[in-house]
């Protein structure tokens, strides 16, 4: 395996942030904002965060000047009309997520998040570097395990990870790619520095909202797209299809690709069906596939058809009842044996979870240096590992000022914010950390950056994160320009997950003046002359969560895992 040896041991601590300019430090100074930006007149705790539209003196930052000029003359009625137009468009298009068996619209805020061309170039390079290093790491872990033999990371880090699947040994992708799609979660700290919060290498969801957010915003704000060089996002599915077709065995000139879904009760089913439709491939459930002689076939109205690549949106544990959960009816019996025989490719690969485990995350800077011989271009959030004695003691001493996260948690569940926790909650999490040190990490409270967001009849700061999506086709790592910006709609909240009341924003990456990248075009205006509609609560479609064994086995993922 190609890698660069280091002359000295690399620190296992996460990297500190880059030194920031003094002009970016400190809380913002009060400045009166008129009209719809009145929500910025009482910042409260938001004054500690880096605001992406306004600098410390309240001046509008360069990438947002056009948006500010468009929105600032608006009154509350026009703001509400545009917001309702966005909401109606989502409901009309059936864009929902499932929460506790109920289909709910996914809130889209009307103020886009804007990233300059120069800033995006830095992020793109950092994401690409990270995906390449993690690809090499996974190939090594399920192969020669040189990184373990060299003592660069502890062997027990891998063997104790519940997503390290020995069943994946011997499954060698034809083009060497295990991470076909990655979602790298980023936050922007109080100094304005982007940091990696989490890696998602299994079935990262949310890209459908990126595309639908853009389509809807282009209808509601066509004039903004006409005056901004916003890079297009609609070609994601073509990049994904190319990656999946490239993943097939080299002797397959026209491989059959399918999208494997747990079914309509899964929280991300809308995304599964959208991607299948846009790629022009079949959307299948486990019952539509079967294995014979280590070959996977699809049942069709015209008979059996061999399947070459499966883009699965099912967790490993449900994928093959012969290898994992024997009670699963969501997967395909014999699928792993077929993959091991080289007759089908599973995308993303089985066992990728050993690369996005939250404890493994703390070693990714070391992994990058080991395999690539490069310094990480994107820093992690500073993280303490409770399984190391000295770091655990520090966590227990400072538990009331840290964020304590379960290593296996998702969707924002199980996180304890020390500063907001009661004595009873702190005592409970202390016991959990002591009982299972491997299961917990701790981080300082990071004031996520803020972007203006509609709150009532005004725009006010709300915290955001960002999930860019990277697609690896074996020749290149392509990063979708933008990604999913999630916003914590509840005042003061740092939790952006949709399952916890979060929403989303359209994410604009501006092209440079010399760029040849495709630009987004606005659709016909649908709002400016619209009368304000009467308010009515949209009916929600229920989902019977107990109708069958299969429903009971649906992985109840938050929309953005």
Annotate each language-model stretch with its function.
Residues 1-561:
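Preference for protein termini
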